[in-house]
Amino acid sequence: MQKYCIYQHFQFQLLIQHLWIAANCDIADERFDATFHTNVLVNSSGHCQYLPPGIFKSSCYIDVRWFPFDVQHCKLKFGSWSYGGWSLDLQMQEADISGYIPNGEWDLVGIPGKRSERFYECCKEPYPDVTFTVTMRRRTLYYGLNLLIPCVLISALALLVFLLPADSGEKISLGITVLLSLTVFMLLVAEIMPATSDSVPLIAQYFASTMIIVGLSVVVTVIVLQYHHHDPDGGKMPKWTRVILLNWCAWFLRMKRPGEDKVRPACQHKQRRCSLASVEMSAVAPPPASNGNLLYIGFRGLDGVHCVPTPDSGVVCGRMACSPTHDEHLLHGGQPPEGDPDLAKILEEVRYIANRFRCQDESEAVCSEWKFAACVVDRLCLMAFSVFTIICTIGILMSAPNFVEAVSKDFA
């Protein structure tokens, strides 16, 4: 009696050449088939399992609008070119990412899939396809430490241009140095970014705005230096400039001119007596006995102060004990009552010296006015550029949709 073995389930392997496979349209490589052909596992029910390993390359659109806080979506579409849905039915399964190795530049967010059917004019049957969307988020730690943070620090250094004194001679040098540094970082960004004109990257917008701020700071610095080193012979400050800068802007910035808070001289009223400790002269001295020192001191003592003469002093607050009209008459061409030629010559010399000092005082006043205007412009630009820099930094960088997520995950 013979015994027969009945196998209810068995499987064997076949070469891929012995089986029919469908032509798919998921390849975007220079080679048409990027898979490695392995044997097909066939069981007794006719089920065939074919798992060829392969590297699939796909062409996808890269959106650099939010670089380096961008999220990219690449689609992998699997379908058949030769067989429709009546001959070949594609079913979608979830993508297995258990063997995914983390990357230092990208984070794999997910691979969602979607099955769709498409109808063509030539055929009545549908053509199914399965599309997997690979969603990746760029890790921003590298770009933040090497590009963003240095750019923020350099833009902060640009504000120091307005704090540097004009007499140092380094305001223009500092501004140009900061501008060149930003240009170097801009070139680094251009090397990293793909050559596309579809959109302006976020980091390029930030660098461009920072370079505009630094460039304007250099222009303003030139104006400030022109104000600070203004030639007094070039004319006085225009009225509108004086009103805007020295009055309105100075009041808004709480700035005061040098010497504005000084204590006023002691002799201000008619009834107050004034005397100079360094000048002691006798009122009984006759006019012919006067010398050049007396007249010089009488003119340059305290200019512009009018006081009532004291009975025991011939000099009051730096002026002679005579009326202002009499002083001006002597210093502006008037002849002394005695007609002494020596005294006339002395008065002529005193008149020249007085005019010289008066011109020097006027030149110093004009220079001081222009220098104060330069300080006001510096302070005003420091405030305005600081606010503009903060607004640009926060507004541009935080406009990225996943800015908070990127900072919390990459910089934590």
Curated annotation (Swiss-Prot):
Q: Which UniProt keywords apply?
A: Membrane, Transmembrane, Transmembrane helix
What does the UniProt entry say about where the protein is found?
Membrane
Molecular functions (GO terms): acetylcholine-gated monoatomic cation-selective channel activity; transmembrane signaling receptor activity
Q: Which residues cross the membrane?
A: 144-164, 172-192, 205-225, 240-254, 380-400
Q: Domain of life, per the record? A: Eukaryota
- How would you describe this protein's topology in the membrane? Multi-pass membrane protein
Show the PANTHER family listed in the entry.
Answer: NEUROTRANSMITTER GATED ION CHANNEL
- The protein here is known as CHRNA7-FAM7A fusion protein
Q: Which organism is it from?
A: Homo sapiens (Human)
